[in-house]
């Protein structure tokens, strides 16, 4: 079985999981040598993508206007941040056929509503708790 490294680069922190272990470090303290060696690397990035420069074979996630039953409220996939997109896809996986209201409280506060049929109704982004 392949060793898969999942990385999330946010505005404030870099988080990763590998073989069931979760790690997080502030972006300003992140160095590539903190990451374990992996056969496959997948990353979500709303922060500084160059933090992974020098890491080979990284597959960066992108937003899509449609994915399986998900249908974005935005006409242009790039208008929906990959972090919000992946959160909605994950929530739909864990709570199928249910209306889902998502709140993400990170550097920014985001709110999104996805109906049971997968139709994204839109969302809101505002400054995070540390800024308010």
Regions picked out by a protein language model, each given a short descriptive name:
Residues 114:
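C-terminal, flexible cofactor-proximal segment of oxidoreductases
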């Amino acid at each position: 079985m392949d060793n898969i490294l999942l990385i999330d680069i946010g505005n404030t922190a870099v988080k990763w999981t590998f073989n069931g272990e979760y790690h997080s470090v502030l972006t300003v303290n992140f160095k590539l040598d903190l990451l374990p060696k992996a056969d496959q690397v997948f990353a979500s990035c709303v922060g500084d993508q160059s933090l992974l420069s020098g890491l080979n074979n990284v597959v960066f996630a992108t937003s899509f206007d449609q994915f399986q039953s998900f249908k974005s409220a935005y006409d242009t996939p790039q208008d929906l941040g990959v972090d919000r997109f992946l959160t909605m896809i994950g929530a739909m996986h864990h709570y199928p056929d249910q209306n889902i209201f998502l709140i993400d409280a990170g550097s920014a506060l985001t709110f999104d509503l996805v109906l049971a049929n997968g139709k994204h109704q839109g969302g809101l982004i505002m400054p995070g708790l540390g800024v308010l």
